[in-house]
Amino acid sequence: MPEDSSSLDYAMEKASGPHFSGLRFDGLLSSSPPNSSVVSSLRSAVSSSSPSSSDPEAPKQPFIIGVSGGTASGKTTVCDMIIQQLHDHRVVLVNQDSFYRGLTSEELQRVQEYNFDHPDAFDTEQLLHCAETLKSGQPYQVPIYDFKTHQRRSDTFRQVNASDVIILEGILVFHDSRVRNLMNMKIFVDTDADVRLARRIRRDTVERGRDVNSVLEQYAKFVKPAFDDFVLPSKKYADVIIPRGGDNHVAVDLITQHIHTKLGQHDLCKIYPNVYVIQSTFQIRGMHTLIREKDISKHDFVFYSDRLIRLVVEHGLGHLPFTEKQVVTPTGAVYTGVDFCKKLCGVSIIRSGESMENALRACCKGIKIGKILIHRDGDNGKQLIYEKLPHDISERHVLLLDPVLATGNSANQAIELLIQKGVPEAHIIFLNLISAPEGIHCVCKRFPALKIVTSEIDQCLNQEFRVIPGLGEFGDRYFGTDEEDQ
């Protein structure tokens, strides 16, 4: 039911601090391994889950936030605070109350006995259609529910346009898994039951003209049982739990900071938190422009590719574990810093991956580098021809090197080999210059603990499975073998 957005006395509430139960953005997609032999299905997955990844004209996918909690818990207040702090982005609020079913004549005669807090009271199918439409970047006409007549207004709607952030608010927005899986972040507002009851009494008596006895009777008969049976169990799906609702300014600040970060990321980074794209600058875009130019000289292609590769390697090293270390400076003062992970090696996927070895050696003196050769054309890129890896690779963190992630088939074969050799999946960091969305889906859905570090995510794969816009055959251009073929 609609809640009072104003603050109340929280003297009876002693809970403090936000509780983070883990940000699970990977829940948006299934974690089951994809069929890597059918690249066309991967392309379909990309187009359906992330339209802006493969179509430059498609609208940018919005960031969907679900806000749930008991009646009068402060959900609306939290939503208003988030909207205010995201003032530089377009934000729309869709309230689940708008999707109440209109009551039949029989139900209207016994409206005092109607349970408005039961899942059946809502038109979940229309709410799902609304969320899917807004997620696709299209506008939607949200119905307006009249709580006096308990019917939807047939003559007026609220037009909701595509926005950067969409907030779905309601007591049961987490109840249906189809709606829940559309959300990028799920927030549960947890407020003491006595506080919620006091708010509800004030709201229903002041705003809806009801007497206190009828409010208490409805609360005991419907609201409290529905909370215990449906609302409270959905708390387990929340990514973030906020005690004290709108009074918890620290929690709301942390949430909005996280949303700001996600809004600045590629859509695939919102889906897969283990994908890292180095921050784009004019320098990086300029180097990408140079190496993608088909008429660039081999010398310039190698020079600017090496510069970009060095940046990717440096960024990848930043994801390795570090330990605190203190050193004495020439001035005699003590400096507290960090020490690099000692157990580290590189593995290049021959032959394009060998182009990244010089940058890795320049960053990590004396590093061991293994090699894997996979026949890309035969057996759908899954034929292992050669491998030479450090004998103690299972004890090391591995930087897997391949400048272009296209279908992901060769990468999956290489990663499977490393895991067979005893390397923990979480110890593998896959470094590349450019990535296709199809390849990211293929690798991340199969190996969710692995990290991918890239300098740019391109649009898609074409019918020949080449990355578009891409940069051609990287190995041939880097080593000059394309000139020999001409």
From Swiss-Prot:
Broad class of enzyme this protein falls into: transferase
InterPro entries with a match to the protein in the record: P-loop_NTPase, PRibTrfase_dom, PRK/URK, PRTase-like, Uridine_kinase-like
EC number(s) per entry: 2.7.1.48
Catalytic reactions on record: cytidine + ATP = CMP + ADP + H(+); uridine + ATP = UMP + ADP + H(+)
Tissue specificity: Expressed in roots, leaves and stems.
Residue spans crossing the bilayer: none
GO cellular component: chloroplast; cytoplasm
Bias kind Low complexity: ranges: 31-54
Organelle transit peptide residues: 1-47
The entry's keywords: Allosteric enzyme, Chloroplast, Cytoplasm, Glycosyltransferase, GTP-binding, Kinase, Multifunctional enzyme, Nucleotide-binding, Plastid, Transferase, Transit peptide
Annotated localization: Plastid, Chloroplast; Cytoplasm
Annotated spans, Disordered: 31-67
Keyword Glycosyltransferase attributed: yes
Region (Uridine kinase) residue spans: 59-264
Pathway assignment: Pyrimidine metabolism; CTP biosynthesis via salvage pathway; CTP from cytidine: step 1/3; Pyrimidine metabolism; UMP biosynthesis via salvage pathway; UMP from uridine: step 1/1
One BP annotation, GO: regulation of starch metabolic process
Region annotation (Uracil phosphoribosyltransferase) ranges: 274-486
Protein residues bound to GTP: 298, 307, 341-344, 396
Binding site for 5-phospho-alpha-D-ribose 1-diphosphate: 351, 376, 402, 407-410, 473
Predominant subcellular localization, coarse grouping: plastid
Membership in a protein family: In the N-terminal section; belongs to the uridine kinase family. In the C-terminal section; belongs to the UPRTase family.
Function: Involved in the pyrimidine salvage pathway. Phosphorylates uridine to uridine monophosphate (UMP). Phosphorylates cytidine to cytidine monophosphate (CMP). Does not possess uracil phosphoribosyltransferase (UPRTase) activity that catalyzes the conversion of uracil and 5-phospho-alpha-D-ribose 1-diphosphate (PRPP) to UMP and diphosphate.
Protein name: Uridine/cytidine kinase UKL1, chloroplastic
